[in-house]
């Protein structure tokens, strides 16, 4: 399954707010279920809940189905909680790090900057959005002057308290902001409200 490129509002209306996909918000609506539909809903509810959690994770981080499945397989082979390791792998992607630092409004915007070779990690150009960032990595932007002015205005209005503790944003040089990876992210700093165990359960027969 390819990466979704359709209307983002349609997705968040179905899956609720996904900060990585879009900064637009929708109000949650609870559907009323009639008595005749309750028995049917009970049969599909567990699968439906797991599917929705999986879809929220996939669309928030902008992954294809195959990419997410591969991350689940990697997490299963690692020591520790599969769900937490899965979230850690996704959060430490370069495109997500740019988003969490406030360099871009969404993860798709970050992916565009990376693909255009405007992002440096430790002074080396990285053009792979899935690049796995590590502690002590330094991230900088080498973009056209037109974007630099947009970035400066964005960072001026971006609240630093939104940046998770495992990252640091330096504005000592306004025209050359830097992002620092302090350590691997912990569960409390994950930017998406998600029950990762539901995702692991969804893939239990596939991974």
UniProtKB/Swiss-Prot annotation:
A GO molecular function assigned to this protein is:
rRNA binding
Example GO CC term: the record gives:
chloroplast
- What's in the keyword line of the UniProt record? Chloroplast, Plastid, Ribonucleoprotein, Ribosomal protein, RNA-binding, rRNA-binding
> What is annotated about its quaternary structure and interactions?
Part of the 30S ribosomal subunit. Contacts protein S5. The interaction surface between S4 and S5 is involved in control of translational fidelity.
> Its GO biological process terms?
ribosomal small subunit biogenesis; translation
Q: Which PANTHER family match?
A: 30S 40S RIBOSOMAL PROTEIN (PTHR11831), SMALL RIBOSOMAL SUBUNIT PROTEIN US4M (PTHR11831:SF4)
**Cross-referenced InterPro entries:** Ribosomal_uS4, Ribosomal_uS4_bac-type, Ribosomal_uS4_CS, Ribosomal_uS4_N, S4_RNA-bd, S4_RNA-bd_sf
Q: Does the keyword Ribonucleoprotein apply?
A: yes
Q: Where does this one sit in the cell?
A: Plastid, Chloroplast
Name the family.
Belongs to the universal ribosomal protein uS4 family.
State the function annotated in the UniProt record.
Answer: One of the primary rRNA binding proteins, it binds directly to 16S rRNA where it nucleates assembly of the body of the 30S subunit.
Instruction: Provide the disulphide bond pattern.
Output: none
Q: What is this protein called?
A: Small ribosomal subunit protein uS4c
- Record keywords: Transmembrane helix included? no
Q: Could you tell me which CDD domains the record lists for this protein?
A: S4
Domain of life from the UniProt record: Eukaryota
Organism equals: Equisetum hyemale (Dutch rush)
In terms of Pfam families, this protein maps to:
Ribosomal_S4 (PF00163), S4 (PF01479)
Q: What Gene3D superfamilies does the database record attribute to this sequence?
A: Ribosomal Protein S4 Delta 41, Chain A, domain 1 (1.10.1050.10), RNA-binding S4 domain (3.10.290.10)
> Where do the S4 RNA-binding domain residues begin and end?
92-153
């Amino acid at each position: 399954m390819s990466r979704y490129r359709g209307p983002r509002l349609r997705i968040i209306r179905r899956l609720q707010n996904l900060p990585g996909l879009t900064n637009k918000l929708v109000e949650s609506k609870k559907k009323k279920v009639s008595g005749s539909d309750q028995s049917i809903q009970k049969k599909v509810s567990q699968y439906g809940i797991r599917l929705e959690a999986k879809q929220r994770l996939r669309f928030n981080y902008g992954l294809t189905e195959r990419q997410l499945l591969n991350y689940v397989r990697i997490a299963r082979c690692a020591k520790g909680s599969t769900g937490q390791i899965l979230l850690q792998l996704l959060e430490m992607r370069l495109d997500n790090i740019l988003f969490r630092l406030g360099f871009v409004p969404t993860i798709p915007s970050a992916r565009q900057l990376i693909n255009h070779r405007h992002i440096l990690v430790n002074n080396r150009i990285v053009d792979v959005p899935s690049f796995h960032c590590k502690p002590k990595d330094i991230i900088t932007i080498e973009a056209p002057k037109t974007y630099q002015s947009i970035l400066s205005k964005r960072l001026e209005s971006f609240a630093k308290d939104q940046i998770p503790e495992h990252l640091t944003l330096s504005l000592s040089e306004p025209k050359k902001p830097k992002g620092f990876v302090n350590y691997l992210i912990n569960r409390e700093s994950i930017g998406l409200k998600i029950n990762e165990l539901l995702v692991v359960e969804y893939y239990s027969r596939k991974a």
